[in-house]
Amino acid sequence: MQVNISGQHVEVTQPLRDYVLEKLARVESHFDKITNVQVIMKVEKLQQKVEATLQIPGGEVVANAEHEDMYAAIDALADKLDRQLKKHKEKQQSLLQGAAAR
């Protein structure tokens, strides 16, 4: 999995980078076919925003999160990605089971 982390109006420090990689490792443990990840951290007024785009076979998964604290925004983003990938995985499995039943 190739990971690209960038920041707009915020310096991406090593602790922030490590925290993002730790959360992405948790996400990858649920869905191991992620090929590329683009994470963008932004600061707009008083809100910390994080956007992520995951490339997976058959498309991509996009999630956004914002919070007053960057670490909390990263946590919320990881939760959203987890939910979306679980939904995608369940959908793929149900399609395979439906095709096998025919």
From Swiss-Prot:
UniProt KW keywords: Translation regulation
SUPFAM superfamilies xref list = Ribosome binding protein Y (YfiA homologue)
- This protein's superkingdom? Bacteria
Q: Which residues cross the membrane?
A: none
Example GO biological process: negative regulation of translational elongation
Whether Aminoacyl-tRNA synthetase counts among this entry's keywords is no
Pfam families referenced in this protein's UniProt entry, alphabetically: Ribosomal_S30AE
Q: Does the keyword Acetylation apply?
A: no
Task: Mention any one GO cellular component term assigned to this protein in its UniProt record.
Answer: cytosolic small ribosomal subunit
Molecular function (GO) terms for this protein are: ribosomal small subunit binding
Q: What does this protein do?
A: During stationary phase, promotes and stabilizes dimerization of 70S ribosomes by the ribosome modulation factor (RMF), leading to the formation of inactive 100S ribosomes.
Subunit structure, interactors included = Associates exclusively with 100S ribosomes, which are dimers of 70S ribosomes.
The family annotation for this protein states: Belongs to the HPF/YfiA ribosome-associated protein family. Short HPF subfamily.
Put simply, this protein is called Ribosome hibernation promoting factor
Gene for this protein? hpf
